[in-house]
Amino acid sequence: YAFEMYSLAANAGDSYSMNRLALMYDRGEHVEQDFYEAFDWYMKAAEAGLPAAMSNVASMYRHGEGVNQDYDEAMTWFRKAAYEGYSYALYAIGELYLGGYGVAEDSTEAAAWYQRASDAGEPNGHWSLALRYLYGDGVAMDTRKAGDLAYLALVNGLDLALEEFKEISTADTSPNFRRRIQELLKQDGFYRGSVDGSFGPQTMRAVEAAFGSAL
């Protein structure tokens, strides 16, 4: 029923419905997966001025789904979406610079875009910028700031942040970073243990309790 409803509205020219219909084709929800149909509907919605669709067009170009892979087109459409204030696109531009996709690899430029995304409240931006500060890649190393940003991503419900935190207990990360996370968990009432940088079961339970708590 949802598919028919969005299909009718999309064909009547509603840009939001065009993007929803494209998502259904993209993910194979209520209809057989079809990247080509998805791309066509994303493009129609993007040309109708919908920022989320502009970002989706860019993603299709980046991954070569439903269209030939083209990093220049990906950058163009991510920039259009970013210009319209779509925060995910700010993060995605950072990803293109970090990986050198269609541009010269530039971790400083990547960090600047992650910062813009983070400032706009994008959880992916918080997390990616946290990693730059944690390892001093593209910015001066600042493990405390890395902790603040990683925590922001966690409480804003970024699945990737929760998955990565589960690895942190064994990963070779800065003790200062881990202590900062514990301080923040304690401040928000999720953690009652000692701030020792050791990510044991008690800290991990606190991390899971904090996940998505700002939403």
Predicted features by range, described:
Residues A112, W127, L131-L134, A140-L160:
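TPR/TPR-like (Sel1-like) alpha-helical repeat modules
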Residues P175-N176, K186-L215:
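Short acidic, glycine/serine/threonine-rich helix-capping segments at coil-helix boundaries
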Residues R20-R27, V31, M54-H63, L90-G99, ...:
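Hydrophobic face of amphipathic alpha-helices that form TPR/SEL1-like repeat modules
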